[in-house]
Every structure is written in structure tokens, then in C-alpha cells.
Curated annotation (Swiss-Prot):
One of its GO terms (molecular function) is zinc ion binding. This is Putative Polyprotein CP. It comes from Cassava vein mosaic virus (CsVMV). Pfam families: MP, zf-CCHC. Residues 386-398 have a biased composition (Polar residues).
């Protein structure tokens, strides 16, 4: 934008108070700290990249303020230490008033930044002018150097006259000095004449060079270097060639060092600035001297010297700009009174809109008299006329003009209708359809049918507001319409009062004269006290009181407040946006959908977290397959590149997407047959082809005529039948159609003719619908007095006790039927040898069912109605015991874990080691609950199945838990596992015909995975309690499940069978199943995430209440064998588990202590019983090995329910163990030029560099008061500064290199693995790279506004080290 256009820009609409430290990185156009670019009033975005940050570019703000916003008087006031109120009022510029309240240091810094930009521009131009002048002088200096070279010759040989551009001819040595002739000085007009003169004399010099050469040989007979024989010096042509080469080399060097010299250039500018300030303080004025070449007559104005003219033009232009800005400041001083009125209107009106009206429409206002002369509208009493006549002298013969606009405010006494109109008199399509009936004619019928599917939304586009006042008529209006009219009347009157500059008394009369009809009668009937309350001390205050009185009388102010009105509007908008649907992609329907969605979105007032889900819903509501395609395309193509995710961007992408699809289909030959365009209105986006497309009229479909008419006859006594046209007979191979009976499944008859007993319908809808809704939600909830759960110390779980051996004599099936727990003590092969029979007995009186096991050969799975269900990958039977333990190290041996305790402190753990296979199984295990897994056997189908409507829903959701909800809790926090909002969303997805029929929700099962946000191997016992908080008495009835466990694996998983129903109208639905927890053994810093809870809920939406066999399935829980070592359910009965009267947070016992207890007598009996069973199968070698293991553990005194492993001596031999996230970085600072592995940890770990890197390379760091202590492998202590700077070079997927300066990587941390050359980046570094994203394949970080993806190294840490050693060797 040119400088002349500054007057047309309203800076107040764009400028905001900007903190310079919070500006984004690329706010400066070219240089960091200064710029001389052109003015570009564009809005830029903030540092996060999301959300609209209305910050004016700092560069533009500096240029604007320098060129016109601050004058000399304002600058002098701002430079004072203390600014008084009088001086503050004298400030003319609004920008000066904003910064007048700041500190002196901030004001001076602000003024310096303003002067820096324009001064740098002048300095830059002066510097370029000097450079060009130097280029002109450089050629002359080269000529001088040639002349000086001749001066070095002895005087006896050659004589060179001084101060001349011509050279004498060299004479012989015998000639006297007095006979030498000197060429007279010639005045050279310009540079070209001087060069031509020298070239002419060069030939004379070359003729005498021979003499010089001979003389040189006589004086100096020593051998000389190789030179051309005819001359000592080069010819002028050769000298010119050398000069050109030097210039070319200098130009290339300047281009190469241009980028490196940008910061140097800024330093030169600062030095020049300081020098200018010093000279200015001493009273010295810098004068640029004119350029005078010796023996050359300078001209007054040269065409070649463009830089001098440019400087003069710029100086003149700046002077004109300053004069122009000074005039604008004088005009702005005249508008200070109007700005005072703006401050009064801040609470009543929108300041931005009012500013436009005031600044653009202030003119010499002459008030005409239209209302005062109309006696029909203004019927004023005698007292009022006297007051008005008395105040007419103050008006200076000016009159008030009230403008009446719009038919809705038109008032006529002769045509007043008090009878309300029917509700469908307005032209609204949604209301109008209810009164449309089908026409008898087919054309009208088709037209009406088409209108039913047209757009049903019309936006209110009438947004005009009068600036001259309006008549207020509230006759025959509803409270809603009265609110709208009063609001519009208030806005129009406020602008009119400010524009006409009326006094308080004149404003009161002006307001009263706008009342007509019922409003006028209401105001007349008011008492004097009531009228005084409606009046104020200022015109706008009186208008505000009058607005409140009108709203209380005619509107809804007495019924609901503004806050309640806003909340109601928000809730209605949120409810409507969920019900919004679009079924046809016609352009009219699409435009209506966009308009209505936009209105509800802005009225609902969503937060930033909710906004993204709602914006995704904008695409998901489109008909399939367009909704998912558009959403995926937007997320992949636009969202990563666009700086602002808004409705406008999504609307634009949707229109472009439809346009592109229609263009693709148009190029194909059979566009109408393609499935991709069947629901799109491509004619709206196509290029017009008028008259080319044939419009076919509607035709009925022709059907096959079965009968033909007979011939006409004049007279026929008998009425014969019509002629019959038989169809062709097709002979079939099997004339009888094969039918199959639904009851018995046999062919040959149908179910009504079946003779077998009728089959009862158990489940109406076996094909259940699954909706997966994966969302990330932050845990934000509060509790009240009722949301309390008591936790008491729970005894350590002991192995199952079995009855004596005599009770189980007989075959295995009898034993299992008598004791279901006996199945855990036999092997799998013995289970295969059993003769299983399906037995089902039902006692009608007791309503009990015996427990039976069913074996299905087709799927090879075991199922039990009350016990756990496992897939074929899981196993039942005896645990395999391997390895050996060492009592000297005092180790606890768990399944896959070895703990090494300290010798001096037995409770302190020194090292914890895992097996890679065990940990790999844990990490790969995830949520896998499905409806088929829960509702697999017939008994469960009978339990949960219903004849009526049933929809089986599976939802998936994850909650990250903050550390403040675990450590130092003032309140007991719970997590609702079910949410009413989730239920409502799933009900919206089922067919419309069944949505209104859903009345109950049957909670079938919930699968829970708890994942830690810290590394594995930390002994962290925890307790989980599932409760139904709706039950207050009895207390034990609220307990659903109690579990104790340990997060030593980083993950635990279990499934709970809930099996009870709730009503969809229950207001306490969120309390139907909640989770409480207690975790110990670890402490983390504030604002850290300690673990996450992922839920997969299975529930049934039904129209009836499901209550069958509830007692049989109460308390069922599924814990897979891989997690049975780290989590167990409490063996207490729920009736015996009582809550104490007062909540006491007791310390949970460490889960590892149960492994230290000695073997009890019951456990030894169980081992002996298992030995007897294994001895019966001598032919099985594997069982014999298990027998040996049992003998070994019986001697050691260990429990048979504990799985031990041998001690792992070398964990480094473990392969394919890349569970951690590693990338490769190269440290390039100083002597550090090596590749190192970088571990990414998003948990609570701090960032650090291993002591090996710091010790070997000795990084240079800043000295601070706080230091950091680190230990290496030899337990040597090293101290480093806390703010050590390290430059790490990262390589993205496209092999582009990025150098990042990381500060503060070294933290106080004892490196247990000592000496390992590794770098760890924790949350304190990753938070500075927001937004960042970690996937299985790459790490995505944000540098400025650029997204960088870095590949993950999917190798073991030991393999990575070997590869890096080779890379470092090649690098060296």
C-alpha cells in the first residue's frame, strides 16, 4: 500500500494492544527486530496455529505510528517521568493515550521502536547512495593507481608531472631537465573524457617503455622475472580486463555473504544510530559532502546521479506526509467531544459499530420538522407545549426529524386490526407445508411433492438500523416480537441522540414523541414518581431506563433475565444442531443446511475443545458416502495447511469438492449411471448449455397389455368375453418350487404345515448394530457430599482352597459339577479326555439353573455361564514353572519380573528386569470385547434376548487422569463410566422408526484398560472400586466390584459383566456406574498425566425392561491369564463388605508382598494332589517335566499360584524389543559432531543428556545460580549449569535438515544406567513444540508454522547404537 493511502485506513478496526514478547516468530517481514517493507494491513495468526488472533503486524503498527499517529507534542509528554491528568488530557493521539499509563521504561522502548523502522529506511537509502558513489570513484582510483605506479620509477628515467591526467613523453638521459616540456592541464568535463585522454597517452608511454627497459638492465644487471619484452606494464585493454575480473569476483562474494551479513548490517545501523544521537546531543549536524573529482568540473545536475535525486524526492515526500498527518491530527482534535460520547455508549451499544457511524456520518446536521407538524401522531398536552415552546429558543431554530421506515411499523388510525392473524400467514415453508393438500391433477401433485423436499430454512437478512430515530408501535405484538422491536428502536434512537447532540431535556421529549398506540397510553397513565424513575441525568441513561421499563411492561424482562435468556438460547441451539439433517445434496438444500448450521453453531457458544467435534459433525451429517469422504479429504489436505479451522474454510472446501466431482463425472460418457453422482445436483455447478439439453416430459410407464379389445359391432345380442392373449409357456426342470421350513429347517413344507413342535422366538434381531465412537475427553468433574466411596485396607488375596481329596473321588466330570473351581487344577489334555454331556435342568419352584459347561467342536472354545470365557488363544490349566531363584539377592520373582532389593535397605528396590516376550504380550494386548464374545452361547442369548426392539451398542472412549486427582486429594474423585450424552448420540444413529420407542438401557458389560504414563518396572499398587452411586442404603448394595492390582506392567485389563438395566429418563444416569481409585508408590510433579482409563462399553437399547436371572450373573469378572499376576478381584462377599462411618485413606499394601509369604499347608496339599494327577499320565513327557518343576518349588517353599522365571543375566541380548520411541539426532555444536539416539518420553520424565556426552565433549553453557548434579557409570559426580544449550540436527521424512537449539536439557537426575550416550526429550521440551503428535511411525512437531515429521527408528536400542557407531566412523 502506498503512503498516500494511509488516510483511507481506519486503524482502530484492526489495531489492538499487542505485547511485543507474545508476537509470533514471523511477524517481522525480513529482519528480526526491524524492517523497511511496505505497509501491509493484514491480520496474522498466533503462535499456536489455531483460533483467530487479531493482532496487527508489528511492522505495520510501527510504520503507521511513525508516519502520522504520534506528533511532536505527544512525544514530549510521553518522555516525562510522571504524566499528570492535565497532560494526559492534552494528548491528541489515541495511541499516545493507550501507552500513557505505562511505565517510563516501557514508553521509551515503545518510542524507540517507532523511530527505528523509519530511521532504518533513511539509513538504508543513504548507504545505498554511498555505495553507488564509491563505484564511481573506484574507476578513478584505479587510474590514480596507474599514475602512482609511474611515480615509483627513478627521476633520471622518467618525469611524471603532478596533478594532471596527462603524462609527458620520456626523454633520453642526456637531455636536461629544463628542456622537458610539460603538457598543460586540461579541464575534463566528465569521466569518459578523462579515460579517453589516458588511453590516447598510453600509446606514447608504450613507445618509451623500451628506453626504460634498457635503463633498468644497466642499473640492475641481475636476472629479472619473466615479463613481456616490449613493456613492463600491461596495456590499457589488459588492465581493463583485470578490472572487470575483480569487479565480478567482488560481486559474487557480496552475493554469497549477503545472507550472513544481514545481522551485521543491523549492527552497523545501530552504531550509526548511536552516532547520530551523540552528534545530535552535541549540536553537530551531519552534512554529506559533495563529490568533486580532481581536474574535473562537476555539474549541478547530472542525469547519471539518480541516487541524489532519489534522496531529495524521498525527503520532499516525507515532509509532505508529515504536513498531511499534522493536519489530520488537528482534525482529530475537533472530534474529542464525540469520543467522550463513545465512552458513555460502551455499555449500551457495540463500540465498533458506533465508531463507524460517528466517524463517517458526522456532518452539519439540520433537523427538519415532520413530526412536530403532524397533529395525528403527536398529541401533546398544554403543559408539554409550553415546555417545548420554552425550549425552542435553545434549539437555534433547529427542528427534530424522526424517520419512519418499514411496513411493520406503519400506523394508521383508520385501519387498525386488533384480531390476530393465523399462524401461517407468514411465508415460511416449514409452516406452510402443513396446510398444503394433494391436488387432483397429477402435475400439481408432482409439484407439491417436490416442494416437500426443498430447503426448509430462511435466514433473517433484515439488519438495517435507522440513524434518525424510529416510531415505536407495540400494538398486537407478542412478547418475543416486542423484544425485537424495542431492541431495534433502542439502537436507532441511541445513534440519533448522539448524532443530533441533544440535551437531556430535549432527549426526553424526543423519546416521548416516538411513542404511539398502546405505548403512548401506557406512558400517560404512569404516575409522576414512575416517570421520574424512568428519567436519567444523561440522554443515553434516560434511553436505557426507558428501554428497561418497556421490556418489563411489554416484553419478557419480568419473566426471565438476560442471563437465563442467553442460557436458554444456547441450550436450544445445541439441541437443534444435533437434530439437523440433510438427505439430498441439492444446492438449495445445501445452502439452507449451511446457513442453519452456522446460526446454531454461533448461538451454542462452544468451547475450543467442543468446537472441533462439532465442526467434524458438519461433514458427518451429509448423506453417505459424501460425509466421510469430505471429512477425510479435509483433514488430510486442508487442515494441516490452513492456519484457521473455521466454518468458512469447511464450507469453501465442501463447495469445491462438489464442483470437482461434478467436473469429473461430466467428462465421462455415462455420467448419470455413475454411483458417485446419484445424489448430487451437478447442474448447479456445470457450465451453462442453454437450449442444448432436451427436456423430456413426464410419461407413464407402458405395461404389457394382457387383453386386447374385440372388434366393434353395431348389434350383438350376446356379450362374449374379451379375447385372451396367453403368455408363452416356459417348461421348468422342477416345476415345484423348493421351500424350506423355518421351524425345523427341512425342505418340502413351510412352517404353518410343520408337524413338529413350534419353535419359540427368542431373539428378534440377532444382527446387532455396533457403533464405535472413539473420543478423547479431558477429565473435568466435580463431586458433592453424596459422591463418596470408602476404602478400607483389604487383606492380601490368597490362593483358592480346595476341599479334601475324598470328596472328589470318581471321574473328572463329577468333580467339576460339584466344584467348578476344580477346573483350574487339571490339565488341558485331561479336559479333552472327558465325556461331556449337555445337561440343563430347570426347577420351576426355585427358579434356579445349575452350572454346566458346554464344549463346541466347531469353534474349539470353552465357555461357562458363571466362570470366565476365554478364546482359543488363551489357556486353562496348570501354570508352567521354570527358572531358579537366588536367596542371596533377596529377590521377588513374579511372572516375567525379577526384583533385586538393596542389601542395606531391604525395602528399597535397586533393579527390576522384565522378559521381552512377557512385556511384548502385555503391550500388544488391547480392548477386544465384542457382542459376539459376550452373547455367544445360547444361555446368554436367552438371558439378554428380547422379542421386541433391541440394538447392541459398543462404544470406545478414553479418559486421561491428571495427577491432582490421585495425589493429595481434598475431595474423593470418581469417574462416570456412562454418559447421557453418549446415549443420546447413539440413539440418534438408529433408524427413525425406533428412536421414540427406546425406553431402557441394559448395561451388559464394560471392558477397562488402565495404562500408566510412566515407565515399566515401578512398584505402584492401586485399588479400583466400581459402584452404583444411586444407591444410598444399604451401603453394601452400591458396590459392584472391588479390585486390587499393580501397574508394574504399565497396563492392566479386565472385563466386568454388569447385567442391570436403567431407564433412559433417569436424571442420575451418570451415577449408574462410577469408578473410584487409589494409587500409591509414585509421586509426580504438578500438571502431569499419571494414567489413562480406556473404556469399551457394551449395552443394549430396548423398549422393555430386561430382568432375567440377575442373581446368577452378579459379580462376574473376566481377567485374562496374562494379567492375573498383577490384578485380582476381592474375595469378600458384598454383604460382608461394609463401609466405615468415616473415610480414612489407608495405605495399600504393596502387591509384591504376597509373593514373600511362606507356603501354607493348604497350598502343599494342593501341590500333592496335582502330583498324583500327573503321575497317572506317565506316557506324557510334558506332564513329567511339570512334575519335576512342582517338586522343585515344593522344596523352595513357594506357592503353586506364583509363576517364576530364571534370572536374566544379560538383558542386552534381547532382540525386537523396540517398545520405546527413538529418533536419531546429530549434535553439531563445537566439537560435537556425532549421531546420538534420542528417546521421546511423553510421561512425567524430565529432559536430560547423559553424563557421558557432557563429560567427553565438555559443552559450553551459561553460568547460572542453580546447577545440576549428574553421575556417570563409575558413580563420579559432575556439575553442569541448568541452562546448557545444545544444537541438535534433526532429519525429516523428506531428508531435509533442521537445526534446533534446545535449552535446559540437563536436569537433576541420577542416571541409573550410567555412561549410556543417550538424550531424552520429555514433556518440558515437547510442550514448547506444540502442537506435536506421536504415532507408531513418526514424530510430528511444529516449528513456527511449519509441520515436520521425523521417522521413528523401529529397532532395539542396542541395534541403534551399533548403527550409529558406523555412522560416526564414516562421519569422521
Amino acid at each position: 500500500m502506498d503512503s498516500k493511502d494511509f488516510t483511507q485506513l481506519n486503524l482502530e478496526e484492526h489495531s489492538y494492544k499487542v505485547n511485543r514478547e507474545k508476537l509470533p516468530i514471523d511477524s517481522y517481514i525480513q529482519y528480526g527486530g526491524f524492517t523497511y517493507a511496505n505497509f501491509t494491513p493484514y491480520i496474522i495468526h498466533g503462535d499456536d496455529g489455531f483460533g483467530e488472533h487479531k493482532q496487527l503486524n508489528w511492522t505495520n503498527k510501527l510504520l503507521w505510528n511513525k508516519l502520522g499517529k504520534l506528533n511532536i507534542k505527544d512525544t514530549q509528554i510521553l518522555m516525562q517521568n510522571n504524566i499528570s491528568e492535565e497532560q494526559h488530557n492534552e494528548l491528541i493521539s489515541l495511541e499516545a493515550q493507550k501507552i500513557a499509563r505505562e511505565n517510563l521504561a516501557d514508553r521509551i522502548n515503545y518510542l524507540q521502536n517507532i523511530n527505528t523502522s523509519i530511521d532504518f529506511k533513511l539509513w538504508k537509502m543513504n548507504k545505498e547512495n554511498l555505495e553507488r558513489q564509491e563505484l564511481l570513484l573506484r574507476q578513478i582510483n584505479e587510474l590514480k593507481e596507474e599514475i602512482k605506479s609511474l611515480k615509483n620509477i627513478p627521476s633520471t628515467v622518467a618525469i611524471i608531472p603532478t596533478n594532471t591526467y596527462t603524462i609527458n613523453m620520456i626523454r633520453t638521459e642526456t637531455e636536461d631537465w629544463k628542456y622537458f616540456k610539460y603538457i598543460e592541464k586540461e579541464l575534463v568535463q566528465n569521466k569518459t573524457e578523462a579515460i579517453a585522454k589516458i588511453l590516447d597517452n598510453s600509446y606514447i608511454i608504450n613507445d618509451n617503455l623500451g628506453l626504460l627497459y634498457e635503463r633498468y638492465e644497466e642499473i640492475n644487471p641481475t636476472p629479472k622475472p619473466y615479463k613481456r619484452p616490449e613493456t613492463i606494464f600491461d596495456t590499457p585493454q589488459y588492465a581493463k580486463y583485470i578490472r572487470n575480473q575483480k569487479r565480478q569476483e567482488e560481486y559474487e562474494k557480496q552475493q554469497e555473504l549477503k545472507k550472513e551479513n544481514e545481522n551485521k548490517e543491523y549492527q552497523e545501523f545501530l552504531e550509526w544510530k548511536e552516532k547520530q544521537q551523540k552528534d545530535k546531543g552535541k549540536g553537530i549536524q551531519t552534512v554529506y559532502p559533495t563529490l568533486i573529482i580532481p581536474d574535473i568540473k562537476p555539474e549541478k545536475q547530472k542525469k547519471e546521479d539518480m541516487m541524489l535525486e532519489m534522496i531529495k524526492n524521498l525527503q520532499n515526500e516525507l515532509e509532505q506526509l508529515k504536513i498531511q498527518r499534522h493536519k489530520e491530527h488537528e482534525k482529530q482534535a475537533e472530534l474529542t467531544k464525540i469520543q467522550m460520547l463513545e465512552e458513555e455508549l460502551e455499555e449500551e451499544l457495540d463500540p465498533d459499530n458506533l465508531e463507524k457511524e460517528v466517524l463517517n456520518n458526522i456532518q452539519n446536521i439540520q433537523i427538519s420538522s415532520d413530526i412536530s407538524e403532524s397533529s395525528e401522531i403527536n398529541e401533546i398536552s398544554d403543559n408539554e407545549t409550553e415546555q417545548i415552546s420554552g425550549s425552542d429558543s435553545d434549539y437555534n431554530n433547529e427542528q427534530i426529524n424522526v424517520k419512519i421506515e418499514g411496513e411493520e411499523y406503519e400506523y394508521k388510525d383508520n385501519y387498525r386490526y386488533y384480531k390476530p392473524q393465523p399462524p401461517y400467514y407468514k411465508k415460511d415453508i416449514r409452516r406452510e407445508r402443513q396446510y398444503k393438500g394433494q391436488s387432483s391433477q397429477r402435475a400439481d401433485y408432482i409439484k407439491n411433492r417436490r416442494e416437500q423436499f426443498e430447503s426448509t430454512y430462511q435466514a433473517n437478512m433484515n439488519t438495517t438500523i435507522n440513524d434518525s430515530g424510529e416510531i415505536l408501535n407495540l400494538d398486537c405484538t407478542t412478547p418475543e416480537e416486542a423484544e425485537d422491536r424495542i431492541q431495534k428502536w433502542t439502537q436507532s434512537m441511541s445513534i440519533a441522540l448522539v448524532k443530533q447532540q441533544l440535551s437531556n431535556e430535549q432527549a426526553k421529549q424526543f423519546i416521548r414523541r416516538t411513542f404511539i398506540g398502546n405505548v403512548k397510553e401506557w406512558y400517560k397513565n404512569l404516575t409522576n414518581e414512575a416517570k421520574q424513575k424512568l428519567e436519567g441525568n444523561a440522554p443515553l441513561l434516560s434511553l436505557t431506563h426507558m428501554e428497561l421499563g418497556l421490556r418489563a411492561e411489554f416484553g419478557k424482562l419480568g419473566i426471565e433475565s438476560d442471563v437465563e435468556k442467553h442460557e436458554k438460547k444456547t441450550s436450544i441451539a445445541r439441541h437443534k444442531i444435533l437434530q439437523l439433517q440433510i438427505c439430498s445434496m441439492d444446492h438449495q438444500n445445501l445452502n439452507a443446511y449451511l446457513c442453519e448450521f452456522q446460526e446454531y453453531y454461533y448461538s451454542a457458544n462452544y468451547t475450543e475443545a467442543e468446537s472441533e467435534n462439532i465442526l467434524n459433525m458438519f461433514y458427518s451429517k451429509l448423506p453417505e458416502p459424501w460425509g466421510q469422504q469430505v471429512l477425510n479429504g479435509y483433514l488430510s489436505e486442508i487442515k494441516g495447511k490452513n492456519l484457521l479451522d473455521s466454518i468458512g474454510a469447511r464450507m469453501t472446501y465442501l463447495q469445491e469438492f462438489i464442483s470437482d466431482k461434478c467436473k469429473e463425472n461430466w467428462t465421462q460418457k455415462q455420467a448419470r449411471k455413475i454411483q458417485l453422482s446419484k445424489n448430487l445436483d451437478c447442474s448447479y455447478y456445470e457450465v451453462g448449455k442453454y437450449g442444448c439439453k432436451q427436456i423430456r416430459p413426464h410419461k407413464r410407464k407402458r405395461y404389457y397389455k394382457k387383453y386386447i379389445p374385440i372388434k366393434r359391432k353395431y348389434f350383438n345380442k350376446k356379450r362374449y368375453k374379451k379375447y385372451y392373449r396367453p403368455k408363452k409357456f416356459l417348461k421348468r426342470k422342477n416345476p415345484h418350487k423348493a421351500c424350506k421350513c423355518y421351524n425345523c429347517g427341512e425342505e418340502g413344507h413351510i412352517s404353518p404345515n410343520c408337524k413338529k413342535p413350534k419353535k419359540k422366538t427368542r431373539i428378534n434381531n440377532l444382527e446387532a448394530l455396533e457403533f464405535k465412537n472413539t473420543e478423547m475427553e479431558n477429565l473435568e468433574f466435580e463431586t458433592n457430599k453424596n459422591d463418596i466411596i470408602w476404602v478400607e485396607e483389604i487383606e492380601v488375596i490368597q490362593p483358592l482352597h480346595y476341599e479334601e481329596e475324598e470328596k472328589y473321588k470318581g471321574n473328572y466330570s463329577d468333580r467339576i459339577l460339584q466344584n467348578p473351581y476344580y477346573i483350574n487344577s487339571i490339565s488341558i489334555e485331561e479336559l479333552d479326555n472327558l465325556d461331556w454331556e449337555f445337561e440343563y435342568q430347570e426347577d420351576i419352584e426355585d427358579d434356579l439353573e445349575y452350572q454346566n459347561f458346554v464344549y463346541q467342536e466347531s469353534n474349539d472354545n470353552w465357555y461357562s455361564d458363571q466362570e470366565n470365557w476365554y478364546s482359543d488363544e488363551q489357556y486353562l490349566g496348570i501354570y508352567m514353572f521354570i527358572g531358579e531363584t537366588s536367596g542371596e539377592n533377596n529377590q521377588d520373582n513374579m511372572e516375567g519380573i525379577i526384583k533385586e532389593y538393596n542389601k542395606t535397605e531391604p525395602e528399597k528396590i535397586n533393579k527390576i528386569i522384565f522378559t521381552s516376550e512377557k512385556f511384548k504380550q502385555i503391550m500388544e494386548n488391547d480392548l477386544n470385547m465384542t457382542k459376539d464374545k459376550i452373547f455367544h452361547n445360547n444361555k446368554l442369548k436367552k438371558l439378554f434376548g428380547k422379542k421386541e426392539i433391541e440394538y447392541y451398542i459398543v462404544t470406545d472412549i478414553e479418559h486421561p487422569i491428571d495427577v491432582k486427582y490421585v495425589q493429595n486429594q481434598d475431595k474423593i474423585i470418581n469417574l462416570p463410566l456412562y454418559n447421557q450424552e453418549i446415549f443420546e448420540n447413539e440413539i440418534q444413529k438408529i433408524p427413525d422408526k425406533d428412536q421414540n420407542k427406546i425406553r431402557n438401557i441394559h448395561l451388559a458389560a464394560v471392558e477397562i484398560v488402565v495404562k500408566a504414563y510412566f515407565r515399566e518396572g515401578i512398584d505402584t499398587p492401586f485399588e479400583i472400586i466400581l459402584c452404583d452411586d444411586r444407591i444410598t442404603y444399604p451401603q453394601e448394595g452400591s458396590l459392584v466390584e472391588v479390585l486390587i492390582g499393580n501397574l508394574i506392567y504399565q497396563k492392566v485389563k479386565f472385563t466386568k459383566i454388569i447385567n442391570y438395566s436403567i431407564s433412559i429418563e433417569d436424571k442420575n444416569l451418570d451415577k449408574s456406574l462410577v469408578m473410584y481409585w487409589n494409587l500409591e508408590g509414585i509421586k509426580m510433579i504438578k500438571d502431569s498425566k499419571i494414567f489413562s482409563i480406556r473404556l469399551r462399553n457394551l449395552y443394549v437399547l430396548s423398549n422393555k425392561h430386561i430382568v432375567k436371572n440377575k442373581k446368577q450373573y452378579n459379580g462376574n469378572i473376566i481377567i485374562e491369564p496374562i494379567f492375573q499376576d498383577v490384578i485380582q478381584n476381592n474375595n469378600r462377599n458384598y454383604i460382608e463388605y461394609g463401609k466405615p462411618g468415616k473415610f480414612d485413606r489407608t495405605k495399600l499394601k504393596s502387591y509384591s508382598r504376597r509373593f514373600n509369604e511362606p507356603l501354607r499347608l493348604d497350598d502343599r496339599t494342593n501341590i500333592q494332589r496335582e502330583k498324583d494327577q500327573i503321575e497317572k499320565a506317565d506316557h506324557n513327557l510334558e506332564l513329567q517335566k511339570e512334575l519335576n518343576n512342582l517338586n522343585y518349588y515344593s522344596q523352595q517353599g513357594q506357592s503353586s499360584n506364583v509363576l517364576d522365571i530364571p534370572k536374566i543375566l544379560k538383558i542386552e541380548n534381547t532382540k525386537n524389543n523396540y517398545k520405546q520411541f527413538h529418533i536419531i539426532g546429530k549434535i553439531t555444536e563445537g566439537r560435537l559432531n556425532k549421531f546420538y539416539p534420542i528417546l521421546i518420553d511423553t510421561g512425567a520424565a524430565d529432559s536430560y543428556i547423559s553424563s557421558k556426552i557432557l563429560e567427553d565433549e565438555k559443552l559450553v553453557s551459561n553460568k547460572l545460580s542453580k546447577v545440576v548434579t549428574s553421575y556417570n557409570a563409575d558413580n563420579e559426580k559432575h556439575i553442569y549449569d541448568r541452562n546448557t544449550e545444545v544444537i541438535i540436527e534433526l532429519i525429516d521424512k523428506n531428508n531435509e535438515k533442521y537445526k534446533i537449539n534446545f535449552i535446559g536439557l540437563v536436569d537433576q537426575l541420577r542416571l541409573l544406567e550410567g555412561g549410556k550416550a543417550e538424550i531424552l526429550l520429555g514433556m518440558n521440551i515437547l510442550q514448547n513444540l506444540k502442537p506435536y503428535c506421536i504415532t507408531d511411525d513418526y514424530l510430528e512437531i511444529n516449528l513456527g508454522f511449519r509441520c515436520i515429521k521425523i521417522n521413528r527408528i523401529k529397532k532395539d536400542i542396542f541395534e541403534i547404537r551399533e548403527d550409529l557407531q558406523q555412522m560416526n566412523v564414516l562421519n569422521e
